[in-house]
Amino acid sequence: MKSIPKLFGTSGIRGKYQEEITLELALDVARALAKYIGGKNKKVVIGRDTRTSGKIIENVMSAGLQQSGCDVLLLGMVPTPVVGYATLKKEADAGIMITASHNPSQYNGIKLWNSDGLAYKQDQERTIEKLVYEKDFNIVKWNEIGKEYDISSFKDKYIDDIVAKSGINPLKPLKVVVDCACGAGSYLSPEALRRAGMNVITLNAQPDGSFPGRRPEPNEANLGELMKTVKALNADVGLAHDGDADRMIAVDENGNLSDFDKLLTIMAKEFGGTVVTTVDASACLDIQMQKIGGNVLRTPVGDVHVAESINKNKGTFGGEPSGTWLHPDFCMCPDGLLSGLRIVRTIQKNGKLSKQLDAIENYPTIRQKVTCENSKKKTVMSIVEEKFEEEFDDVKEILTIDGVRISFEDDSWVLIRPSGTEPYIRITAEGKTQEHLNSIEKISNEFLNNII
């Protein structure tokens, strides 16, 4: 019996348009989703980012859903969090976001959402894959075909609701530069900040799926213009999004890109209680949360894992160092726009972003990768799980939920995990001192090189 091909990765289905992401696949995924949620009279929300292939994929998926008896609610071009929120508020049975997030313009993808605004879990994705593989669809009669509705006006409600939820003081305006990457947040993110009373300067805020202003990945290599502009205009903060605006990265008032882990920690401290992050996040989060009586739970890499843990453990906040943050008091969908508003609120409340970041201790880190054929990864990781801890004598805690993460008595740590997309084993480590980090790095590399 043939194994069912894997379509979903860590964040939906993703690939190059007309290669991995074909119109035939989009049609079949829509039909499979319709079958999964019950078909006739069910409602599905669809949104898309600015990519040039988005509209035609939207058309095909809408047709597949209607062909299966579902009604389709079209948002048009919107950030991913609008899809999650609309699915929740419109009491739809599912949501679809057509996006490849931070990937280049020739890519696109499909991400699915539950009725509560939570991304599809792995077991749900496996079911969709099985239905697609077996072509197990229910096509309805001519008089049972679903209808299509335009709900693009919902965007205004979303903006009003995130502004209200953010806690921003409109009587204390700050100068904010926002770089939208010509992505799905190009209108909504600046508009939300303006409605919140901020003085807004925009960069790359013209929707364009070829991403002419900068690459959609919000990292230091792509944010030079934002950093220069913040400093030149004496702005209070700069905000940057990826292609679908489910992420947010900040630049401080001096034009320096914020350390991702520290930025996550600043926001987590605002909520307190139980916060959730991934295995690759810095120990600075744990240390700062301990100081205020909170605690940190860790999950495998991927926002859906963070969301599941928040739900299960009544978390107050969650996120990944990449800038993907979840605000459970609003919606379980990662939301870069609300994240940006709330960072502005912390500056109003606590002062300059640079000072907030400087108050969190720096720890030296390394991020490396060791070449390992995909066929060897399972064997290598089983040896890591069984033997790696024996290389150290000051182990405090071991996590094996996504690779192997070893924490040491001084709060240093090392994570070894296989890349999900490339032929590498990744080493991430953080040391309380440079000397300890150097020792961890040497031991980790020697161990891996001996078993690969």
Curated annotation (Swiss-Prot):
The reaction(s) this protein catalyses: alpha-D-glucosamine 1-phosphate = D-glucosamine 6-phosphate
Keyword flag Metal-binding: yes
Amino acids binding Mg(2+): 101, 242, 244, 246
Active site: 101
SUPFAM superfamilies according to UniProt: Phosphoglucomutase, C-terminal domain, Phosphoglucomutase, first 3 domains
Modification Phosphoserine, positions: 101
CC cofactor: Mg(2+)
Pfam families per the UniProt record, alphabetical: PGM_PMM_I, PGM_PMM_II, PGM_PMM_III, PGM_PMM_IV
A single GO BP: carbohydrate metabolic process
Keywords linked to the UniProt accession: Isomerase, Magnesium, Metal-binding, Phosphoprotein
Post-translational modification: Activated by phosphorylation.
EC code: 5.4.2.10
The keyword Transferase is annotated on this UniProt entry: no
Domain of life: Archaea
Coiled coil: none
Molecular function terms, GO-annotated: magnesium ion binding; phosphoglucosamine mutase activity
Annotated cofactor note: Binds 1 Mg(2+) ion per subunit.
Family: Belongs to the phosphohexose mutase family.
PANTHER family, A to Z: PHOSPHOMANNOMUTASE
NCBIfam families, A to Z: Arch_GlmM
Function text: Catalyzes the conversion of glucosamine-6-phosphate to glucosamine-1-phosphate.
Name by which UniProt lists this protein: Probable phosphoglucosamine mutase
Annotated source species: Methanosphaera stadtmanae (strain ATCC 43021 / DSM 3091 / JCM 11832 / MCB-3)
